[in-house]
Amino acid sequence: MSDVFDGYERQYCELSASLSKKCSSAISLDGEQKKQKLSEIKSGLENAEVLIRKMDLEARTLPPNLKSSLLVKLREFKSDLNNFKTEVKRITSGQLNAAARDELLEAGMADTKTASADQRARLMMSTERLGRTTDRVKDSRRTMMETEEIGVSILQDLHGQRQSLLRAHETLHGVDDNIGKSKKILTDMTRRMNKNKWTIGAIIIALIAAIFIILYFKLTK
């Protein structure tokens, strides 16, 4: 059910009960008092029409399963409003005799009692709906807070994991640097070893040549 529609309905029920009482009291009044009371009634009827239009607009924005039941209520409210308008016309016509006035007064009193009971029932239903809505809002708020706490915990865990990844990245970067340095050292050592091989080879060749020269001179003497 729409909370907005419920609010308009509650206002209309209160206004309807007030109009019923004013119509009943206007029957027994004369002169300026009657004019003042009729002015109040007409102002109330205008407010009632505004509320009905608002309820109609709100009902038509709702899903079909809700809209149908609310439109039935609206027809009842419109019929109730038309009855008030008819009664106001009869009161303002000035053609009521004493018997008719008494009859209308008694009918108005009966309608007031019936309307008051009906309004009380509707107000109680509206209050119960508001109570249930409040409970749902509290449950939703509690769920939202729990979800927020879980979200904060997840964010904290993600932050911790991010820090761990950053430290691991720094460690890997350091390892890469060490590997690069080690590779450079090995390259230098390999280059030196190759250089030493050539040097040793040259020395060996020189020694062999010297031996051959010595042997040659000894054999030729």
Swiss-Prot record:
<feature type="topological domain" description="Vesicular">
    <location>
        <begin position="220"/>
        <end position="221"/>
    </location>
</feature>
<dbReference type="GO" id="GO:0043657">
    <property type="term" value="C:host cell"/>
</dbReference>
<keyword id="KW-0926">Vacuole</keyword>
<comment type="similarity">
    <text>Belongs to the VTI1 family.</text>
</comment>
<protein>
    <recommendedName>
        <fullName>Vesicle transport v-SNARE 11</fullName>
    </recommendedName>
</protein>
<feature type="transmembrane region" description="Helical; Anchor for type IV membrane protein">
    <location>
        <begin position="199"/>
        <end position="219"/>
    </location>
</feature>
<dbReference type="GO" id="GO:0005770">
    <property type="term" value="C:late endosome"/>
</dbReference>
<dbReference type="InterPro" id="IPR027027">
    <property type="entry name" value="GOSR2/Membrin/Bos1"/>
</dbReference>
<dbReference type="GO" id="GO:0000325">
    <property type="term" value="C:plant-type vacuole"/>
</dbReference>
<feature type="coiled-coil region">
    <location>
        <begin position="32"/>
        <end position="93"/>
    </location>
</feature>
<dbReference type="GO" id="GO:0009536">
    <property type="term" value="C:plastid"/>
</dbReference>
<keyword id="KW-0812">Transmembrane</keyword>
<comment type="subunit">
    <text>Forms SNARE complexes with the t-SNAREs SYP51 and either SYP21 or SYP22 in the PVC, and with a much lower affinity with SYP61 in the TGN. Does not interact with SYP41, SYP42 or VPS45. Binds to EPSIN1. Interacts with SCYL2B.</text>
</comment>
<keyword id="KW-0472">Membrane</keyword>
<dbReference type="InterPro" id="IPR010989">
    <property type="entry name" value="SNARE"/>
</dbReference>
<comment type="function">
    <text>Functions as a v-SNARE responsible for targeting AtELP-containing vesicles from the trans-Golgi network (TGN) to the prevacuolar compartment (PVC) and mediates liposome fusion. May be also involved in retrograde traffic to the cis-Golgi. Promotes the formation of vacuolar membrane 'bulbs'. Necessary to deliver proteins to the lytic vacuole, but seems not involved in storage proteins transport. Required for amyloplast sedimentation in the endodermis during shoot gravitropism, which are thus acting as statoliths.</text>
</comment>
<dbReference type="GO" id="GO:0006906">
    <property type="term" value="P:vesicle fusion"/>
</dbReference>
<dbReference type="GO" id="GO:0006623">
    <property type="term" value="P:protein targeting to vacuole"/>
</dbReference>
<dbReference type="GO" id="GO:0005802">
    <property type="term" value="C:trans-Golgi network"/>
</dbReference>
<keyword id="KW-0653">Protein transport</keyword>
<feature type="modified residue" description="N-acetylserine">
    <location>
        <position position="2"/>
    </location>
</feature>
<feature type="topological domain" description="Cytoplasmic">
    <location>
        <begin position="2"/>
        <end position="198"/>
    </location>
</feature>
<dbReference type="Pfam" id="PF05008">
    <property type="entry name" value="V-SNARE"/>
</dbReference>
<keyword id="KW-1133">Transmembrane helix</keyword>
<dbReference type="GO" id="GO:0075733">
    <property type="term" value="P:intracellular transport of virus"/>
</dbReference>
<dbReference type="Pfam" id="PF12352">
    <property type="entry name" value="V-SNARE_C"/>
</dbReference>
<dbReference type="GO" id="GO:0005773">
    <property type="term" value="C:vacuole"/>
</dbReference>
<dbReference type="InterPro" id="IPR038407">
    <property type="entry name" value="v-SNARE_N_sf"/>
</dbReference>
<dbReference type="GO" id="GO:0005774">
    <property type="term" value="C:vacuolar membrane"/>
</dbReference>
<dbReference type="InterPro" id="IPR007705">
    <property type="entry name" value="Vesicle_trsprt_v-SNARE_N"/>
</dbReference>
<keyword id="KW-0007">Acetylation</keyword>
<dbReference type="GO" id="GO:0005484">
    <property type="term" value="F:SNAP receptor activity"/>
</dbReference>
<dbReference type="GO" id="GO:0009630">
    <property type="term" value="P:gravitropism"/>
</dbReference>
<keyword id="KW-0813">Transport</keyword>
<keyword id="KW-0175">Coiled coil</keyword>
<keyword id="KW-0333">Golgi apparatus</keyword>
<dbReference type="GO" id="GO:0080171">
    <property type="term" value="P:lytic vacuole organization"/>
</dbReference>
